[in-house]
Amino acid sequence: MKIGLLIIATNKYIQFLQPLISSADNFFLNNQDVTYYIFTDRDIQIETSRKLCIINTEHKDWPWMTLGRYKIFTENYKELSKMDYIYYCDVDMKFVSDVGNEIISDRVVTIHPGFLGGRGTPEHRIESTAYIAPDENMTYYAGGFNGGSSEKFLEMSTILAERINQDLSRNIIAIWHDESHLNRYMVDNPPTKILDNSYCCIENEYPECGRKLLALIKKHNEVR
């Protein structure tokens, strides 16, 4: 199968790119045909044994870069639709154990490590397209690692890009940006595969969970 791993690495976040790629070379779907799609504003040289597709992407200050991720993916619909499955991974993460075919499914999400299956902090303003009512059943998912079939992922990306743009036109930014919109979408379109927090584990926490993908600790003011 053709697998695309989407990574946004602009401005100071470029420092995390090579370590992530090297870790993915070792641990991410080693039995599949993987292409790394790198969205960046830099001229880069990456060491990898896998295929690379570098897509020039303008950097925007936080939170506009994360809010715009689904728009970026939608703008590259034709290229990304060549893949059978697509996964997005935050660049400031690192694979530390095998991630295999268990993640292959139509709509794949990861339980947020800060909430471990709870409701988390969904968007509470009814004016936002990301709004989740208190009586709606939900589990809170992380925005840092998710994916699915190219058809389902790009369908989601198109819808979320439109919703985020609709919010912005009314001067609304959801509480956790794109992650809030992801969680709203999954209430309406339940995931077909839910990964536990070992697939998005905060660095130096939960060593007992058999960690597979770490969210690296960083000083936000030094990279945003």
Task: Enumerate the language-model features and the residues they cover.
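Short, polar loop motifs at secondary-structure junctions
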Residues: 36-45, 91-99, 198-200
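A conserved donor-nucleotide-binding helix/loop in the catalytic core
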Residues: 57-89, 141, 175-187
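Catalytic core and acceptor-binding pocket of nucleotide-sugar-dependent glycosyltransferases
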Residues: 137-221
